[in-house]
A protein has these predicted regions:
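Basic, Lys/Arg- and aromatic-enriched nucleic-acid-binding interface segment
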Residues: 118-149, 153
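Non-catalytic DNA-binding core/recognition domains of DNA-processing enzymes
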Residues: 1-93, 156, 249-250, 254, ...
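Conserved tyrosine-mediated DNA breakage-rejoining catalytic core shared by Y-recombinases
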Residues: 158-203
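Flexible interdomain linker/hinge and immediately adjacent N-terminus
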Residues: 76-124
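Catalytic-site neighborhood detector that most strongly recognizes the C-terminal catalytic loop/helix
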Residues: 264, 276-303
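Hydrophobic transmembrane helix bundles of membrane-integrated enzymes that assemble
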Residues: 143, 157, 232-240, 256-263, ...
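C-terminal catalytic core of tyrosine-transesterase DNA break-rejoin enzymes
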Residues: 144, 246-283
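Active-site/catalytic core of tyrosine-dependent DNA strand-transfer enzymes
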Residues: 196-255, 260
Length: 303
């Protein structure tokens, strides 16, 4: 099931907006407004926890913060606070021990996955992706673009735009604009950047234009709600097998593995190159290398 927290986030935003004037005041008025804001946030987090797993709640709270940030980038909800005990907390986040538990589970999964990599035949992968690209069914064409450019579903179906580089690069490339999941953190960049591609760049630009004419979406959430239930079975049918079923995220991982194999400069590690081509470099140095660990699912088995 694909969950869309956009509407709930907007409803929560309306509820805390009524406090804006008092939060901008001074003295007792501001103190009381801060207390009410804290109670509203705590109640919303508790409500989410009764319905969803911690991982899903963490995702939902990220949606809430993004909705607030889009309207008021400096809202107090977004600022870390300090208790009298000295402990730091956020109005709209999980408890520190809950976050640590999720992070531990994440690192355990990464260790397990990287201890059992999936073999990948680059030529077979690219050929399958090109066949999908030639389809006039929007989901198949989108899968082809995802595989050949390494972009996420919501980027391919909604936010991405491709253009040709002005200068020749050492690999086939397009300039990609429309990166999602940048976390909107301090130091984050939103600039378009070059990405290597696994097919003719002009062909990919034309395919993206054709895809948008086949079907358009109003938002990333609409993409995830519509394509989320279908993509796993279609991706696995096209690229996986009964023994090794594929997930949509594997397309991005396979793209990264092939690009490292074909295009990575010899004086760079895989981590640095992946951070560049997957857009993790935009997150800033603290997050860029760690995020790339989620995309190391394959090893090149044939050349």
């Amino acid at each position: 099931m694909v969950l869309d927290f956009g509407a709930r986030a907007q409803d929560f935003l309306k509820r805390i907006t009524t406090l804006s004037a008092d939060l901008a005041a001074h003295g007792r008025t501001r103190a009381l407004a801060l207390q009410k804001l804290h109670r509203l946030c705590q109640a919303e987090v508790r409500r989410l926890k009764t319905r969803y797993t911690l991982a899903t709640v963490k995702l939902a709270l990220s949606k809430y913060r993004n909705a607030i940030r889009a309207v008021e980038p400096d809202h107090l909800v977004l600022r870390p606070r300090k208790m009298r005990s000295g402990q730091r907390f956020s109005y709209l986040a999980l408890e520190p021990e809950e976050t640590r538990s999720l992070n531990a589970a994440y690192h355990e999964r990464i260790h397990r996955d990287q201890s059992n990599l999936i073999p990948l035949d680059p030529e077979a992968f690219i050929q399958t992706a090109l066949e999908l690209l030639a389809s006039d069914r929007y989901l198949q064409k989108g899968m082809g673009l995802m595989a050949l450019t390494g972009r996420r579903p919501a980027e391919i179906f909604f936010s991405a735009s491709f253009s040709l580089p002005k200068k020749k690069l050492p690999y086939p490339a397009v300039i990609f604009d429309g990166q999602l999941k940048t976390r909107q953190a301090p130091g984050t960049s939103f600039e378009p950047y070059p990405i290597p591609v696994l097919a003719d760049p002009k062909k990919l630009i034309q395919a993206l234009d054709r895809l948008r004419s086949l079907k358009s979406f109003p938002s990333p959430e609409a993409v995830n709600t519509t394509t989320g239930p279908q993509l796993p079975k279609y991706v696995s049918a096209a690229f996986g097998s009964l023994e090794l079923p594929w997930k949509p995220g594997h397309l991005r991982s396979a793209y990264g593995a092939i690009c490292c194999h074909k295009f990575k400069p010899k004086n760079q590690t895989d981590d640095i190159f992946l951070a560049q081509i997957l857009g993790h470099k935009l997150l800033g140095p603290n997050a860029s290398l760690s995020v790339g660990q989620s995309y190391k699912d394959f090893y090149i088995s044939k050349v």
